[in-house]
Design a protein with these regions (language model features):
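Non-catalytic accessory regions of SAM-dependent methyltransferases
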Residues: 1-116, 171, 175, 181
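Fold-independent oxyanion-binding glycine-rich loops
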Residues: 7-8, 123-124, 156-158
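Generic alpha-helical secondary structure
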Residues: 64-68, 128, 132, 136
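A short interface-forming secondary-structure element
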Residues: 116-129
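Non-catalytic substrate-recognition/targeting regions of SAM-dependent transferases
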Residues: 102-107, 111-113, 132-191
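Short hydrophobic-aromatic micro-motifs
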Residues: 30, 39, 119-122, 186, ...
Length: 191
């Protein structure tokens, strides 16, 4: 896993840009004792996993363009692994899938599932909690650019693991709403 555990942290230094100490959930650079860059990640002061690495490229800036590229890559990857969805002009085999799978897609602590025209998001880390209002609109933009209709994002942030990060539990619509809480799911259409 791309993690730095609490026992591996020797010190947290102030930011060279503003001289302030990194706060819980902030983006931080990780270095070995000898100064060798190891990656950039999200700080979690309450977790035994102190930093979750997002990139090992020192030139990456974790800005809107960075997250948008990662979302686009994850979505394109899912489309190519979901049967007929990858073939132009064919009906998809399914209208549901896991769009973002946490560390596997470079979004530590974020899971996003698609159920027909609704995205269901689970945020499990303080770093992703701080970034969610920046990432969710990018999800909608990526889907829209691909011709996909998404009516809303529903948050299922009621996992007990959030308490270990010092986060409250809640669930509800981030955007959109549905009078019908059910979605029609198609999977493995017979041929």
């Amino acid at each position: 896993h791309p993690w730095v555990f609490e026992g591996e942290v020797i010190r947290v230094e102030p930011s060279p840009e503003n001289g302030e100490r990194a706060q819980n959930g902030c983006i931080v650079d990780v270095f070995e004792e000898n100064g060798t860059y190891q990656g950039t990640g999200l700080l979690s002061e309450m977790s035994k996993i102190r930093v979750r690495i997002v990139t090992r490229n020192a030139n990456d800036r974790l800005n809107e363009a960075f997250w948008s590229r990662k979302i686009s890559w994850a979505w394109e990857h899912r489309k190519t692994t979901m049967g007929n969805r990858a073939l132009p002009g064919t009906e998809p085999d399914t209208n549901c899938c896991r769009v973002i799978f946490s560390e596997a897609d470079g979004f530590p602590g974020l899971i996003v599932d698609r159920y027909e025209n609704v995205l269901v998001a689970q945020v499990g880390t303080v770093g992703m909690e701080r970034l969610r209002d920046a990432i969710y609109p990018l999800l909608l933009e990526v889907f829209s650019a691909d011709g996909q209709v998404i009516d809303g994002i529903y948050e299922r942030n009621d996992s007990p693991s959030r308490l270990k990060e010092g986060l409250p539990q809640y669930k509800g619509w981030w955007t959109g709403s549905s009078s019908d809480e059910n979605s029609l799911i198609a999977e493995s259409t017979p041929t």
